[in-house]
Amino acid sequence: MPASISRSTYASMFGPTTGDRLRLGDTELVIEVERDLTTYGEEVKFGGGKVIRDGMGQSQRTRAEGAMDTVITNALIVDWTGIYKADVGLRDGRIAKIGKAGNPDTQPGVDIVIGPGTEIIAGEGRILTAGGMDAHIHFICPQQIEDSLHSGITTMLGGGTGPAHGTLATTCTPGPWHIGRMLQAADAFPINLAFAGKGNASLPAGLEEQVRAGASCLKLHEDWGTTPAAIDCCLSVADRMDVQVMIHTDTLNESGFVENTLAAIGGRTIHAFHTEGAGGGHAPDIIKVVGAANVIPSSTNPTMPYTANTVEEHLDMLMVCHHLDRSIPEDVAFAESRIRKETIAAEDILHDMGAFSVISSDSQAMGRVGEVITRTWQTAHKMKVQRGRLAEETGANDNQRVRRYIAKYTINPAIAHGLSRHIGSVEEGKRADLVLWQPAFFGAKPDLVLLGGMIVCAQMGDPNGSIPAQPYYSRPMFGAFGGALHASAVTFVSQAAAEDGVGERLRLQKGTLAVEGTRDIGKADMKLNVHRPSIEVNPETYEVRADGELLTCQPLAELPLAQRYFLY
């Protein structure tokens, strides 16, 4: 006989279902479950007296007969593709199927087979997201990787060689020798990594050798001279070799203004870093490029969101990051030209409109590597509080806003850098780089992080406890050690390097995957973040207008996902 139970009872047993709503952390963001791919009355759940037992929810099928390696049961997926409930089957380190798990011999509608060789991760009452991607990394110290991973980032892309002064200021791993050493160093870390070569040159040979050596992209930075000639040369190499170009434009406008830079780019695809300008770029109007079809605009997180402390802290950061001297007036003027509260305020609103497409960190070089995800959701919260619900929302929820913001650190950087066939979303066929969250801790502290289908870090209690008891904090797990590390994580390289056998040549232990499809894309390919307003910046007051509308908002004095989550 069918039985009926209350929604609250059902949610406590199997997690929320279609029509249920829940709050993300302590923010004002509320999501609603759009659909449920599991079957009422046939849900699978692990535990004493539960469903996943021999002959019940667990079949006799072997791995060779299609049983999964791992099943995440009853998870609430939050992704750019939607907000929905499902079981997720993992095989060979990838997402094999999203649907209904169980035993096809005893249950109807099963498309994810649980067998004797299947591990279970309980997703009931938890949120499942794709692992984040941080596409603006200065590899200044290896300890960044731990902080990033434990925040929910599973892919880091950038450049550097350690605390050399070139790396402290620019995201470049210059030259084949340094690229080779960094690719070898990547073998030590349980995270996907990709390295950017230096893109500043007026002749192509020095750039081509870096791409062949394994650089997955090239970085143009003003500290190396981002002249029109360097821009044109770098993009020409990128077009021939299918790698992305990132640009930090000329703050001092020495070699031209923003219009000259756009002319040098010539309609070719480019990823514009810290497009608001506090992190660097044509002062005061680099923000104009958000309206260009070929430019993928991104933010770095120190200006996200605009708060009471944002402007004050930036001057000191600039002096350190760009090797400036407070005793030199020109250095101070350089720093002050970049910090404009008007453009910082406009940046929040442009993100909410979907005009900025990506959020990243700028790690230790005016950015906080462990706060990409937290600051994304703080910004979404701030905009909900200050601007209200988005016009495109339907129902009493913030689903559209949540999908827009999660795309900024998952699918959009993956598309921008040619990695979206492998990472960036919770979709079948992609790598099982996944993050599980308790809703109350969403955006602050992940519960589990999986890389290539294996748990690499998790909230864990006292190892000497009879059960995992307090204190709980994020610790590395078995996927972060030994040969499992090399099987779980990958290093992304250029197609030219992959074809040249860079893995064998350098005796890399991690697998390598080639980037692809970076040149025939643009703003229109950025999921849920495609808006292209016409931007005007007043050169005297720095006021920003989008399609004639003044963009301004107040700084917040208090944020969610902050001190109450990080007492120790």
Curated annotation (Swiss-Prot):
Post-translational modification note: Carboxylation allows a single lysine to coordinate two nickel ions.
Gene3D superfamilies xref list: Metal-dependent hydrolases, Urease, subunit C, domain 1
Quick one: which residues bind Ni(2+) 2?
219, 248, 274
Q: Which reaction does it catalyse?
A: urea + 2 H2O + H(+) = hydrogencarbonate + 2 NH4(+)
Enumerate the active-site residues.
Answer: 322 (proton donor)
Question: PTM N6-carboxylysine: at which residues?
Answer: 219
Q: How, per the record, is the cofactor bound?
A: Binds 2 nickel ions per subunit.
Q: Which part of the chain is the Urease domain?
A: 131-568
Q: In which pathway does it act?
A: Nitrogen metabolism; urea degradation; CO(2) and NH(3) from urea (urease route): step 1/1
Under which EC number(s) is this enzyme classified?
A: 3.5.1.5
Names of the cofactor(s) = Ni cation
Instruction: Extract the signal peptide range.
Output: none
Locate the residues binding substrate.
Answer: 221
**Keyword annotations:** Cytoplasm, Hydrolase, Metal-binding, Nickel
Instruction: Give one GO molecular function term.
Output: urease activity
Q: Which residues bind Ni(2+) 1?
A: 136, 138, 219, 362
Q: Where in the cell is it found?
A: Cytoplasm
Annotated InterPro entries? Amidohydro-rel, Metal-dep_hydrolase_composite, Metal_Hydrolase, Urease_alpha_N_dom, Urease_alpha_subunit, Urease_AS, Urease_asu, Urease_asu_c
A single GO BP annotation from the record? urea catabolic process
Q: Which GO terms describe its cellular component?
A: cytoplasm
Q: Which family does it belong to?
A: Belongs to the metallo-dependent hydrolases superfamily. Urease alpha subunit family.
Oligomeric state and interaction partners are given as: Heterotrimer of UreA (gamma), UreB (beta) and UreC (alpha) subunits. Three heterotrimers associate to form the active enzyme.
PANTHER family xref list: UREASE (PTHR43440:SF1)
Protein name according to UniProt: Urease subunit alpha
Organism this protein belongs to: Cereibacter sphaeroides (strain KD131 / KCTC 12085) (Rhodobacter sphaeroides)
Q: Which gene encodes it?
A: ureC
